């Protein structure tokens, strides 16, 4: 950049201010040790800065909340809103598709307690008009029954009626409050049939009595659900055309957005975002359950997940799969483990220099891993293998204790009851893992034998052959050895 070229300096300041907005700062500040020349001061003052050696500019935010489609996953979005509200982060614009349209209306209304209670109690029959069936305690049996009922009803009636959802919307939304909210604009997305054309609706500009229609149109996942008729036109789920409506927020003047993706079906719309548009993605690595079957227990888990993921995004907590107050102790344990491998067992760790090792670890961890974060990655992967749920804030020591006390040979009896209803994909993975349990038992016994017999050569072979899997087993062994109760046990392994 050349001094005096206004356009270049304007862009420079825009990018610097975008960086400050990314960290949600109130001001953008330049601090100089010595007074600036008149020419330099002119450049700063021309671009809105005040002062002489400390030049400040108050940042202006036009923040949007973008709520993607995702059906029964929607509780996650309310959890995100809880965290944002705690930090007094407000929005000028909300854009929502499908369940995002419904949640957008609840958020626009501003009644957190009502939104949370609604999702905590929500079941499939409060959304879809399915035939009554006898109460079933077994989650898997209930899943198959509800899915069969939904498929049969959709085929016979051309889509399951959403009359219960319509009643719930009308009972829980104050239409006058939505219509006359002076601070926040709500835009919903639906798909016009049969053209499959994207329709964006400014909720405050539509007729009051039509507000429920446009919210329901956005969430009508045709043909599984019946389409919505407004006037002479038919409308279906907005996710068919624009699953995550970031572009609408940009077009309506947003300069930054919190984007909440709840794993709705189908690809997201491809858009080109302005260089200085800031967006914070809030999505989870965990699956969120069935897309069309609503379950109160799963909703509560997803509420907690959304809250914790957003708190991590805001820098309050740490972790990738799980949430921690601090991750520093994980590094301490990992350094001790590496020392144990090299000094006590006398293993050689050349695989750490292999690109393939880091690629596999990153693929498993679903995030970047470097030597400094390897200990945390391994700890979280162990927690997953031992069925620890991600809906609480952990201390590293507490997590290690829970891992060491949990038997990997079997799933906890109450695990499904704590999670709630699973999706088809999750049920398949659950069944597959049950079949793998015997293999896990065999591995554990085998490595216990190698460690007890100090079979260094065989351990080295396994470590070079399958470094990630072997490290996880050895790390668990080491963590157990480090537990106070284990050190004091007279028959410790």
Spans of model-derived segments:
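Patatin-like phospholipase
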Residues: 48-97, 105-493
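Ala/Thr-enriched low-complexity intrinsically disordered regions
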Residues: 6, 18-20, 52-53
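Cysteine-centered motifs
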Residues: 19, 28-29
